[in-house]
Every structure is written in C-alpha cells, then in structure tokens.
Amino acid sequence: MAAVENKEETIREFRTHEGDTGSPEVQVAILTRRIAHLTEHLREHKHDYHSRRGLLKMVGKRRRLLKYLQKKDVERYRTLISRLGLRR
C-alpha cells in the first residue's frame, strides 16, 4: 500500500492540472522514484540481473521522455530537471 501512496504523492506533486496523471512531468517523476528505489535494491542484491534489466529499460524510457519534453517545451524541461535534481 505504501507504493500506491508514494505514487499518488508524486502525481500530486508534479501534475500540471487537476486530474493529470500522464503528462511527461508526472511520468518522469514516477520513473525517477522507481529508478532510485531499484538502485537501492541493486546495491544490496548485486546479482539480480532481471531487476538490472528493468532498471535499464526505465532509464531509457525516462531519457526518451526528457528528450521529448526538451524538444516540446524547454522551460518545462528545465524546471522539471531542477525539481528532480537530475544532472542534465
């Protein structure tokens, strides 16, 4: 149940309007939280290759969404990466 609450909290924090669940900002924020959680898991379980593959897929999806947002609206992109603390 905690995972659902964390996801809903992330959606509330990054949504662009009421009822927004699918904007690039929300999707990137959810992926970033999942990536951070999975990274912690992999620090403890170094040989969990199935989870590592899932992590790489999530990182790729986040990269594509960020690239899309950067092309579509640079200001929203810059705001998002600063709020999430991403290095780009």
Curated annotation (Swiss-Prot):
The keyword Nucleotide-binding does not apply. InterPro entries: Ribosomal_uS15, Ribosomal_uS15_bac-type, uS15_NS1_RNA-bd_sf. One of its GO terms (biological process) is translation. The keyword Lipoprotein does not apply. Keywords: Ribonucleoprotein, Ribosomal protein, RNA-binding, rRNA-binding. Coiled coil: none annotated. CDD domains: Ribosomal_S15p_S13e (cd00353). It holds the Pfam family Ribosomal_S15. GO terms for cellular component: cytosolic small ribosomal subunit. Residues 1-25 are annotated as: Disordered. GO terms for molecular function: rRNA binding; structural constituent of ribosome. Gene3D superfamilies: 6.10.250.3130, S15/NS1, RNA-binding. Belongs to the universal ribosomal protein uS15 family. One of the primary rRNA binding proteins, it binds directly to 16S rRNA where it helps nucleate assembly of the platform of the 30S subunit by binding and bridging several RNA helices of the 16S rRNA. Forms an intersubunit bridge (bridge B4) with the 23S rRNA of the 50S subunit in the ribosome. Part of the 30S ribosomal subunit. Forms a bridge to the 50S subunit in the 70S ribosome, contacting the 23S rRNA. This is Small ribosomal subunit protein uS15. It comes from Rubrobacter xylanophilus (strain DSM 9941 / JCM 11954 / NBRC 16129 / PRD-1).
